[in-house]
Structure formats: structure tokens, C-alpha cells
Amino acid sequence: GIGSAITIWSAHFADTLLHRPALGGAALLDARLYAHSLGTAVVLTGITMGQQAVALIGAGIVMAQAIAGVVAITVQYRRAIAPRLASLALHYAVALVLLATGALLGFLISWSNAHGRSALADGFYLAHTTTMLLGFVGTTVLGTLTVLWPTMLRTPMEPVAPRWTTRGLPYLVGGTALVAACGLWPPLAGLGTLVYLGGACAVLVPAYRTARRVPPTSFATASATASVAWFVGCVAVLGARMSLADDAAAAREVIHSLRLPLAAGFALQILVAALSYLTPVMLGGGPAATRATNAIMDRFAAYRVTAANACLLLALYPGAPWQVRVVAGALAALVTSYLLAGMILSLRE
């Protein structure tokens, strides 16, 4: 799942940024991955069976592996020789703290429902989903883009990017906290979104400057651009609509309405972009083989990105007939599936 992918992602980039092996190395990372999967399964089992004690144990396992990751990155950071990008690793530690917080809030949703406190459950649901989306996923992705974006474009990073990104981190956390608390007072969602997007601009403005120097023409960079656009747009809509909601239940429906664009437009697309970029790196084989793999992964890049996003927009348009929306969604999935075909073709080269 996305949690396991981000766990691997954050560990890899923390190693890269800090130039020091993580505490516990690969063994601790493997243990954390197993614990995350086990904890998630136990939580779902507990909720399905209506056993709150089982769900709490599962949430505790997820929280424990997240805190273990925080400790590993913190020790790794303290042992680093203060390289220029070391402070960016703090994004991963903060994101893991937010993951642990989100896991606890997720359990509290189940606990509230079990005790007939539906209004309280709605409030915890808002806090859980926004903490996981904006905090855990958003903070990790934005922190990583600072380093990965210029690398994907094969150009130097903007000199101000590390400093701006580090200064933007408190705004990401503060904005997430405000949006998470909107179950108490809906307008907090609008205020929190503004604060959060302000923190995101600390990453996106240097990224935009980099893109002006070297336009994103490969599939990976164009897909990443579209993914970030979906994320920013969804966060803006989320904040605006939740701030106008009558109560927590209405705000919950706002989140439900944005699940597909966030999952397909943001999460899936950023994953596809990362895999498209990393496949030539992982396969290796020398410069000639890497160029050949890049050529395969970038075939019809402009068409694939444009078609996938246009079809997704049409699939989400409520005014279109359902038959059109289904066909558009299927076409978007079909175009996106070229990634798998590209990987197979690359292996045969």
C-alpha cells in the first residue's frame, strides 16, 4: 500500500540526504514494513469483528513502527556531517510522527462508532483523513520533490530550495493541524488550507523556477507535474468546501467526493512518475541500456499524460452521462497501464 511505499521511499532518501546508514539498516526497515502490514491487517480485522481491543493492538503496532522510524532518522540526522540537504530529512521524521497520530485517530473513529458517538466519529474521521493525506503523504511527497525534481530534470537545484523547504515545514504541520481540527469549527479548514498551501509554495516556487530553466518533457516529469497540480487543486477545493460545511458529517462527505481525484490524479500518478523515472536506474546495464530504457518509458509521453488526465477529468465530471464517465475512466486506466508494458519491454531489451 501507499504506507509501505512511503516507508521505503523515506528511508532511501534519508540515507541519500544524510550520507549515513540508518540505525538498524535494512533489518530495521524490513521489520518496520512487516509491522506496518501486520498492524494494518490487525486493525481491519478488529474493526470487522467489532473488537476494539484488537483494533487498538493493530493501531499500536503501526504507531510503534512509525516511532521506530522517527528514532532511526533522528539518530541518523545527529550522526550526519551536516551536509547541505540534511535538514530535508526532517520532513520524513515529521511525516512518520503524523502517521502515528493518524493511526491513533483511526482507532478513535472505530471506538466512537462502537460507543454510539457518531458525531464524535465524524470529527475523528476528518482529523484522521486530513492528517494522513496532508501530513503523512503530503509532507513526504513535498519534501522529496525538493531533491527528486531537479534530479529528474537532470539540472542543478535552485540554491534557495533547501532553505525554503525547511522553513516551509512548520507551515505544512500547522496547516495540517488546523484542517484536522475543523470538526470543532468548519472555517478552520479554510484557514488551515491557506497555511498549508503557503508551506507547499516553499517547495513549489523553486520547483517552478527549475522547470522554467529545463522544461519537463519526459513522461516522468510531466506526470509528476500533473500529479502535483491535482494535489494542490484538491487541497484547495477540500479547504473551501469543508469550511462551508454545516457540520462534521457534511465535511466528511466533502472528503468522500474527493477520494477518486486524490487517489487517481495525485497518488497513482506520482507513483507512476516515480516508477517511470526509477525503472531505467534500477535496471542499469550501462549508458546505452539506460538510454534505450528511457526511450521506451518516454514513448508518446505528451499524449499519455494529456490523455490520462483529460479522461480522468471527464470521468469525474458530474454532468456527463454515466456511460461516458465509465468509458473515460477505463481509457485513463488503459493509457496509464503502458507503464507495465514499458517495464516488460525494458526487461526484454
Tell what function each PLM region has.
Residues 1-349:
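Hydrophobic alpha-helical transmembrane segments of multi-pass integral membrane proteins
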